[in-house]
Amino acid sequence: MSYNLEDVSGIGKATAERLRAAGVDTVEKLSLIKVDALSSLKIKGIGESTALKYIKNAQILVNEKGIKTEPQLKKETTPSKPERHQKTETTKEQKPVKGKDLKELIKKQAECNIGLVGHVDHGKTTLVKALTGDWTDRHSEEQERGISIKLGYSNATILYCSECDDYLTYYMAETARKKGQSRYTCPNCSETLEFKRNISFVDAPGHEILMATMLSGASLMNGACLLVSADEICPQPQTREHLEALNIAGIENIIIIQNKIDAVSREQALENYTQIKEFVKGTIAQNAPIIPVSAVFGANLNLVVRAFEEIIKSPEIQENEEFQFLIARSFDINRPGTQINDLNGGVIGGSVLKGTVQIGEEIEIRPGIRVKNNYQPLRTKIASISQGSNFLEEAKPGGLIGLGTMLDSALTKGDSLIGHLVGRPDTLPEIISEVELEVNLLERVLGSEVQMKVQQLKHNEKLLLVVGTEKTAGIVKKILKNSYIVSLSPPICAPVDSIFAISRIINRRYRLIGYGKELN
């Protein structure tokens, strides 16, 4: 009986094809080749340790099955040295980072932010938990009520198995690792995993009363997952509202997650899939992939991670531009009773929009704190830079970052600086208390059970405006031919060319009705 390379333990179809292409086309040849000869063939995914494993497993198969062996693989099957000016494929490829080298790369800063949006209780926080191991509902009220109230944050490392041609997160690999299996190896085939990148998740609340919080989170996202529960009719009110929010924020890299497929039959899942396709027709998510998932049981999470790599690319880093940082959280990390000499300065969390910053540099925070009737910018120095439990020397665009400062922690506690803009002194835009907006209204009110037409803005009407991560009250002061003059309270400092999401009170709730572009 003859055996194929795929019969050797640990060798899959892809690796077998690579071996055949290199001249190692039988189990006998593999069992006789020397380790250095096999590794010198430069076959993707086969280093010295992997070569030794494959050769030993081939020898075991030969001995157990009594396969007749042939003379050792001839030396001429190894590729000859290229001519002096000849370019080879291997010189172009960047050597993948594997094994123990992953330990340091996992500590690197995340490269992009992926948002999770959708209707309340459709499984956004559960999906983050399945991918990262973190439960982002950390606050007591969130845990008591079972819903996300604040923006949740978590980080993940994306890894790749060349043998299985599959993607997974570091947490997924660790939780699936079998007893005795080495770290940083594929739980399915034991192949050493390759590092791809670190990413951050922004878990946005889905409840209707927290729409403004969701809008502020959208400003941090480079791409998004729109979660739709398979056990409910699609679309639900906040599913509509969140998709429009992504449109306003200009987020086009979207993945649709059809969650909770474990709770429905095959027929119900297919019916729900049809509803999703009909819902997104003609929207920015029209061509988005729809991935059926069970976040609770971990079904198809590998397809989700693959979609991250294929659809939501890391943004280009604009390191040479003036540093700007958008604050999404601020807090006091000191425990009650901490001695004065042991107190830490206030911490601000958010994302770098452009440029870079290092420990020890001076920064300015605008609008800052209120002094009588005006706002006074804050100036301080950066004492530390962190992402999760990892400390960094420099912060750059991509991922969610914590900046430790020399500020009195009383100024940062309780998210008091959310929405403020950070930069080097005297480089930030002016603080404004009035803005002229070119307004684009939606045809119909989103997020409400009852569909109704959006009416034009009225003089002295009160609005809720969200720009970046800042939420501010607006009052329509003047109605011009093609724009509106709106007063802002509190004043804001926003990046140039910002988009203002506009909501008005409808049936005692703020509903998204459109967006405005700043003029002048």
Predicted segments, located by residue:
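Compact, charge-rich alpha-helical regulatory domains located at protein termini
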Residues: 1-79
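Helix-rich terminal scaffold detector
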Residues: 82-101, 107-133, 197-200, 220, ...
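Conserved Switch II/interswitch segment of TRAFAC-class P-loop GTPases
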Residues: 196-200, 204-210, 219-241, 249-270
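C-terminal effector modules of nucleic-acid-centric enzymes and ribosome-associated factors
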Residues: 113-116, 264-266, 409-520
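Conserved catalytic-core segments of large NTP-driven translation/proteostasis enzymes
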Residues: 96-97, 105-106, 110, 278-417, ...
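P-loop NTPase switch module centered on the Walker A-proximal segment
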Residues: 85-209, 221
